[in-house]
Amino acid sequence: MAKHDLSDATLPDFKALEAECMSIVLQNGKVPETRAAILPLLKKASIDGREAALRHLTTNGSGLECAGMISNLQDNLITLVHRMVTQAVYPTTQQEFAVAAVGGYGRSTLAPGSDIDLLFLLSVKAGADARKAVEFLLYILWDLGFKVGHATRLVEECIRLSRTDMTIRTAILETRFICGEALLVGELQKRFDAEVVEKTAPEFIAAKLAERDERHRKAGDTRYLVEPNVKEGKGGLRDLHTLFWIAKYYYRISDPADLVKLGVLSRQEWRMFQKSDDFLWAVRCHMHFATGKPEERLSFDLQPEIARNLGYNARPGLSEVERFMKHYFHVAKNVGDLTRIVCASLEDKQAKAAPGLTAAIGRFAHRPRRIPGTPEFIEDRGRIALSGPDIFKRDPINIMRFFHVADLHGLEFHPDALKAITRCLPLIDHDFRENEEANRLFLSILTSKRDPALMLTRMNEAGVLGKFIPDFGRIVSMMQFNMYHHYTVDEHLIRSVGILAEVDQGQHADIHPLAVKLMPNIEERTVLFVAVLLHDIAKGRQEDHSIAGAKVARRLCPRLGLNDKQTELVVWLIDQHLLMSMVAQTRDLHDRKTITDFAEKVQSLDRLRMLLVLTVCDIRAVGPGVWNGWKGQLLRTLYYETELLLSGGFSESPRKERAKQAAEQLAEALSDWSQKDQKTYTKLHYQPYLLTVPLEDQVRHAHFIRQADKADQALATMVRTHSFHAITEITVLAPDHPRLLSIIAGACAAAGANIADAQIFTTSDGRALDTILINREFPIDEDEMRRANTISKMIEDVLAGKKRLPEVIATRTKGRKRNKTFTVKPHVTISNSLSNKFTVIEIECLDRIGLLAEVTAVLADLSLDIHSARITTFGEKVIDTFYVIDLVGQKITNENRQGSISVRLKAVMSEQPDELREQMPSGIIAPAATKSPAAEKKARV
């Protein structure tokens, strides 16, 4: 790549610096004293030069120029030290070695925190002093704080090693002379070209592409990860470097601009190359300057600062960081386009390679063949290719036919064909979009029984999807600045379609069995595929994306060929696509009002089935680890309860009668107990417990409570884990207390456990039976049970007063550092319409360790009795819902009291000073010496 010239004004005065350093060297005869004397001068020059580069980056914005300035600065420093060494310290070595830059430094670009890769080339006549001179130079660089990757070799050694070591071969490919004996570097480059590069291009290209694929696999094989690696990630700088290495090796060029002269890239594509390279270098340089280290991962905490430094401003619906990251992913996509274009050109050159018997046999064996019924396309080694150069210009609809034929025949894509499509994107105009055949073919691709996600991905990468559906084009490369969504919006939508296709094919029944079971019964399969593709299409707008997306669907669906009924169903699904997820995760599914309200919105079993499948696809496509068995269980519970109501099977028998029947069933399940024990332990529970807790859990609880009573334990815990549900259950038996849930939550926080749900019940003898569900951490049950026992021990120790809650919480981090990057405005909603019996309090704020403990402590301090709680985390944001009543069992209807509750909760969520938090109770509720109620009764007798 071209070297970046700098005016003398931008760098320190190296002539004056050299004169001063040379004077010091001549005055000091000893090497150590010489190094120590000149080091401060060189260090100041290095600092001043890098500060100048940062100023230039800030004012000019060019990343390549900044990287070029730092490279030039480094050249000057190395040249200066080399002159001192060879002229004053080891004067006999002037013609015995050369210093060359390799790697990225060899391209005359250097990031602020990057290593300096040097090759010291020795003459065959070099003596011991030459190696001492190299050592002197290296010590200076190390003393200056640089990380130096280096090798000292003869030209012959370089040639020999590069034949077998692809890393060394790549480094030598980019060798650039800095100072010393230039003839040595010239000899290396000449011999390398003749003895190594000649006739080995296919081998080198294959190795570099395999290396790239492995790098992508390690970094995350998508260019749309929302915390990308700017250097190593897909669509990053290393991909551009690989492209240049391949082009330089194959075409024997020294400047990427020569690819235009060779006809590999158009002028427009070359400008894309330059802009992409410059942008990625700007981002990388800013990252290094901001962190003071070679940071390559564009993490959430860095993104806002880099966005500001690059001058991005917020626009309606998109913050400045979201606009910056959209640009970043757009550039990453362009890098992918350029890679395809160059690979297509290389393959074309290979196909026209040297004649001969072997080549002829190879071409015959892989001779392209016609695809029946499609004269426009041919199959070339399992890939769809074009039968002529003007296929798309003659009939633009061939662009859509291309993807449809590839899907029908299960073909991959020839890079030359994709390059042609990219260059013909202007043909996808209004007439194309309104063409009936184009829309029919697209719908066939979307609803394919094969791999629609792959086709959509290729269409998206080629730019076709965004041109064909302009509203989709608006969300291409769009990221959402939060810790919940792992991918850009377009990637999320395509992954959602891929998961729907898997469900449609009956795959992963172990992960989401209900969705797989329901899919064959969904009549409007096409509607579901369209809804899944479009459900987030209106992200990034001022209007709620569900509402705006429904409007987009109402316009688009008729164009795709859907009738009025199908269109309205797609519109409803998009408008309500978050409903089932939010109800399942934030509402008490054992509260009948939850089910009746949800059923009233859904209205039909067909809608219910489709909404369930859409919800599963949406959550699973958010990112790794977001879907788990617990969420699946919540969705299944909501589905089955609603299905029962919509199908007319919801029981209307009196609550009291149903509770009586439940108690009788429990007694029957305990038939091997004495009648006295049966009566005692069935009468412990009130109606809410009997009507909501499954019978098998009631039986477990009965055994648990009786065992605690026999052991005279006032405080006891029981644990079990569910690998399928991905949760671990901790049941706590303790004397009832207003702050019990708060203290349990605090103990869980201290143990590092994330509470997913809480069921709270009071027994007739004044005890609390609380069941806490925490997210699993380990896949193996034995490991998870050890963790669960540790957490339950922490709960017991805190409740028994063996450990003080404020102290154990203080041992944990004060909060997740990454969360501090985000802003979630604290919000409190208090509703009396979501439950017939309870007031529902919902809070939304930034998540942090110990938050639930503090919130529940506030509710207890406000004399509110928590019946149940739902704790839901969306990345950095938490939505906690509490079903509460006052101390006399009534809803909270007084507006003034609701206002005071809201104020107190917002103060805690905002981490404002609060007396309650300062005076948090030690946690003593059930001292170890306290006897159980049964034991006390026995003692009185």
UniProtKB/Swiss-Prot annotation:
UniProt-annotated stretches for the region Disordered: 916-941
Keyword Cytoplasm: no
Residue ranges of the region described as Uridylyltransferase: 1-372
CDD domains: ACT_ACR-UUR-like_2, HDc, NT_GlnE_GlnD_like
Regulation of its function: Uridylyltransferase (UTase) activity is inhibited by glutamine, while glutamine activates uridylyl-removing (UR) activity.
Keyword Acetylation among UniProt keywords: no
Annotated GO biological process: regulation of nitrogen utilization
Region (Uridylyl-removing): 373-728
GO molecular function terms attached to this record: [protein-PII] uridylyltransferase activity; phosphoric diester hydrolase activity
Cofactor(s) it depends on: Mg(2+)
Domain (ACT): residue spans on this chain: 729-810, 840-919
A Pfam family it matches: GlnD_UR_UTase
Reaction catalysis annotation: [protein-PII]-L-tyrosine + UTP = [protein-PII]-uridylyl-L-tyrosine + diphosphate; [protein-PII]-uridylyl-L-tyrosine + H2O = [protein-PII]-L-tyrosine + UMP + H(+)
Keywords: Hydrolase, Magnesium, Multifunctional enzyme, Nucleotidyltransferase, Repeat, Transferase
Documented EC number(s): 2.7.7.59, 3.1.4.-
Record domain HD: where: 489-611
Family per record: Belongs to the GlnD family.
Domain notes from UniProt: Has four distinct domains: an N-terminal nucleotidyltransferase (NT) domain responsible for UTase activity, a central HD domain that encodes UR activity, and two C-terminal ACT domains that seem to have a role in glutamine sensing.
Record's function text: Modifies, by uridylylation and deuridylylation, the PII regulatory proteins (GlnB and homologs), in response to the nitrogen status of the cell that GlnD senses through the glutamine level. Under low glutamine levels, catalyzes the conversion of the PII proteins and UTP to PII-UMP and PPi, while under higher glutamine levels, GlnD hydrolyzes PII-UMP to PII and UMP (deuridylylation). Thus, controls uridylylation state and activity of the PII proteins, and plays an important role in the regulation of nitrogen assimilation and metabolism.
Protein known as: Bifunctional uridylyltransferase/uridylyl-removing enzyme
Species in which this protein is naturally found: Allorhizobium ampelinum (strain ATCC BAA-846 / DSM 112012 / S4) (Agrobacterium vitis (strain S4))
Highest classification ranks of the organism: Bacteria, Pseudomonadati, Pseudomonadota, Alphaproteobacteria, Hyphomicrobiales
